[in-house]
């Protein structure tokens, strides 16, 4: 089992129970899932770019990505409905905790000119979204084999009812928020 999951059960639950004075352990917010999304708009011209992006996402997450398709046609972007334009992965359970641990301890500190993550990126319901400009911050990606530096969106979905609860949950994991 992931160390971060054990830490959550042993330390974080107790800390949040006292901080928000919950009546039950089940009221304590928890991380439900982590979604990684990589939009590859250039895949319209070259299908190989989407395959490379999917391979990168599979290496980072340890799970085969789902190819996302365009919902509607947009003439300005030269896309038609049903065109493959990206890939995404939803992590739950053990893989989610392992990825979350790697994200906090290894990947985020490797971001160039890193001064902390914005605490304003909550959606109003306790879920946190962040963007990564380079996939090479993850140790699974070999810098020499990268065909193109591409970013991704990372969404951490929690069971928190408010942004304050979600912020407290992530801060308990030593999430590097900007001061």
Swiss-Prot record:
Q: Matching Pfam families, A to Z? A: Ribosomal_L5, Ribosomal_L5_C
On whether Transcription is a keyword of this UniProt record, the answer is: no
GO molecular function annotations of the record:
rRNA binding; structural constituent of ribosome; tRNA binding
Q: Its Gene Ontology biological processes? A: translation
Keyword Ribosomal protein: yes or no? yes
User: What InterPro entries does this protein's entry cite?
Assistant: Ribosomal_uL5, Ribosomal_uL5_bac-type, Ribosomal_uL5_C, Ribosomal_uL5_dom_sf, Ribosomal_uL5_N
An annotated GO cellular component: ribosome
**Which Gene3D superfamilies does the entry mention?**
3.30.1440.10
Keywords tagged on the record = Ribonucleoprotein, Ribosomal protein, RNA-binding, rRNA-binding, tRNA-binding
Share what the entry says about its subunit structure, partners included: Part of the 50S ribosomal subunit; part of the 5S rRNA/L5/L18/L25 subcomplex. Contacts the 5S rRNA and the P site tRNA. Forms a bridge to the 30S subunit in the 70S ribosome.
As for what it does, the entry says: This is one of the proteins that bind and probably mediate the attachment of the 5S RNA into the large ribosomal subunit, where it forms part of the central protuberance. In the 70S ribosome it contacts protein S13 of the 30S subunit (bridge B1b), connecting the 2 subunits; this bridge is implicated in subunit movement. Contacts the P site tRNA; the 5S rRNA and some of its associated proteins might help stabilize positioning of ribosome-bound tRNAs.
Q: Give the family from UniProt.
A: Belongs to the universal ribosomal protein uL5 family.
The name this protein goes by in its record:
Large ribosomal subunit protein uL5
Organism the protein comes from: Erwinia tasmaniensis (strain DSM 17950 / CFBP 7177 / CIP 109463 / NCPPB 4357 / Et1/99)
Q: What is the lineage of its organism?
A: Bacteria, Pseudomonadati, Pseudomonadota, Gammaproteobacteria, Enterobacterales
